[in-house]
Amino acid sequence: MAKLTKRQKAIAGKIEAGKAYNFVDAAALLTELSTVKFSESVDVAVNLGVDPRKSDQVVRSATVLPHGTGKTVRVAVFTQGPAAEAALAAGADRVGMDDLAAEMKGGDLNYDVVIASPDAMRVVGQLGQILGPRGLMPNPKVGTVTPDVATAVKNAKAGQVRYRTDKNGIIHTSVGKVGFDAVKLKENVEALIADLKRIKPASSKGIYVKRVTLSTTMGPGLVIDQGSLDV
């Protein structure tokens, strides 16, 4: 069995095994335990009462967090005409059609979000093997295939997070940075859970939000007392 590092021992000594933490207390503890030299992301994992093997119980969507994620988001948009002008005005970093596709085929993939208008999917369809594995393929279910590309760009820049249940029925996403005020982190998580409840699959039975766990990039996961969340 591998030995714990000095940092791991220090962290383990401050965490109560089996405890469900008040959200604000958990956020404060994660900040205290963050000793790395970069600004860590604060992530949440939500265990849902779904069977991900059933297609009608796969939860996939996007939520605009009220306080964003603290990350600078680069957005590329496939569209043309007036929609292209609107996308640029909304803050898109790159807008194009075949020219943008050629750049991506050449390896220029320095984007966090790729958006497309429906008429551009004939071009985007060629990029499935490039964008798909990177989680960048536009999809109407998360609002990245839309005629209103300007709003999609604004949402992405404002800190919209996209998520999908994994094979264990858990969604994972970033909800901010260690430097965020605990109340802002809490409101971001509450917005996410409210959205998850809104899109609850009709066939899901029993407890839907089973567990909420908060963590940092390099830190431990703390189970949250859901009674401390206003959802």
UniProtKB/Swiss-Prot annotation:
Keyword annotations: Repressor, Ribonucleoprotein, Ribosomal protein, RNA-binding, rRNA-binding, Translation regulation, tRNA-binding
One Pfam family matching this protein: Ribosomal_L1
Alphabetical list of SUPFAM superfamilies matching this protein: Ribosomal protein L1 (SSF56808)
Signal in keyword set: no
GO function term, MF aspect, one: structural constituent of ribosome
Span of the signal peptide: none
Annotated PROSITE patterns: RIBOSOMAL_L1
A cellular component annotation (GO) from this entry: cytosolic large ribosomal subunit
One annotated GO biological process: regulation of translation
Quaternary structure (record): Part of the 50S ribosomal subunit.
Sequence similarity: Belongs to the universal ribosomal protein uL1 family.
Function: Binds directly to 23S rRNA. The L1 stalk is quite mobile in the ribosome, and is involved in E site tRNA release.
HAMAP family hit by this protein: Ribosomal_uL1_B (MF_01318_B)
Name of the featured protein: Large ribosomal subunit protein uL1
